[in-house]
Amino acid sequence: MDKRIIVLATKNEGKVREILEILSEYKDQIKTLKELEFDMDLPEETGKSYEENAFIKAKYVAEITGYPVIAEDSGLEIDALQGELGIYSARFGGNVGYKEKISLVLEKMKDTPWEDRKARFICKAVFYDMKEDVKIITGGKVEGYIAYEPKGEKGFGYDPIFYFPLLDKTFGEIDKSEKNKYSHRFLAFSKLKLFLDAYCKGGKI
């Protein structure tokens, strides 16, 4: 049977690159909304968890396109800020760029000592096939610290201030191939890939 298209429900180019690299085996099947010429705004993330927000996006795109969908939601949780930024990471600080968001985080933490700067990236990935009534959710988490200043221009989002002790670098300083061995998104989508492998062998997609 012909392989079915799987839609990637994100407009974040950084996330698109990472997900396609992690799921490279399915690169011919996974299509972005732009590639499929669906000019749509994704729905407002009104959920109270990463899982809920990811599924809100997946369900919305599935209903419009009719295709199986992959979506995700992720965030940065900082202990010293009582778990912020969490599900509001992308909206933190309002409609400003990530340089400004990073500056706001560092300002909030200017008096926080190193031992209290623990943080983690969380990712929840969703595969949703509306026609087959299949919904799979996987997750990934990576622990680190909030650096005192941004370092590196690789990656995207909050990567330049997320210090990863194992490599003694921020995520903004490491190559994408290296990041894709350890990141929260890699962990979540590696688990999702195991499901896709079995699902495809079953002839579903």
From Swiss-Prot:
Keyword tags: Hydrolase, Magnesium, Metal-binding, Nucleotide metabolism, Nucleotide-binding
Cofactor binding, per record: Binds 1 Mg(2+) ion per subunit.
Needed cofactors: Mg(2+)
GO molecular function: dITP diphosphatase activity; ITP diphosphatase activity; metal ion binding; nucleotide binding; ribonucleoside triphosphate phosphatase activity; XTP diphosphatase activity
GO biological process terms, semicolon-separated: nucleotide metabolic process; purine nucleoside triphosphate catabolic process
Family annotation (CDD domains): HAM1
Keyword check for Magnesium: yes
Active site: 73
Recorded catalytic activity of this chain's protein: XTP + H2O = XMP + diphosphate + H(+); dITP + H2O = dIMP + diphosphate + H(+); ITP + H2O = IMP + diphosphate + H(+)
EC identifiers of the protein: 3.6.1.66
InterPro entries: dITP/XTP_pyrophosphatase (IPR020922), ITPase-like_fam (IPR029001), RdgB/HAM1 (IPR002637)
Superkingdom: Bacteria
Keyword Magnesium: yes
GO cellular component: cytosol
Binding positions for Mg(2+) per the UniProt entry: 44, 73
List of residues binding substrate: 10-15, 74, 156-159, 179, 184-185
Family: Belongs to the HAM1 NTPase family.
Assembly information from the UniProt record: Homodimer.
Task performed by this protein: Pyrophosphatase that catalyzes the hydrolysis of nucleoside triphosphates to their monophosphate derivatives, with a high preference for the non-canonical purine nucleotides XTP (xanthosine triphosphate), dITP (deoxyinosine triphosphate) and ITP. Seems to function as a house-cleaning enzyme that removes non-canonical purine nucleotides from the nucleotide pool, thus preventing their incorporation into DNA/RNA and avoiding chromosomal lesions.
The protein's name: dITP/XTP pyrophosphatase
Source organism of the structure: Dictyoglomus thermophilum (strain ATCC 35947 / DSM 3960 / H-6-12)
Phylogenetic placement of the source organism: Bacteria, Pseudomonadati, Dictyoglomota, Dictyoglomia, Dictyoglomales
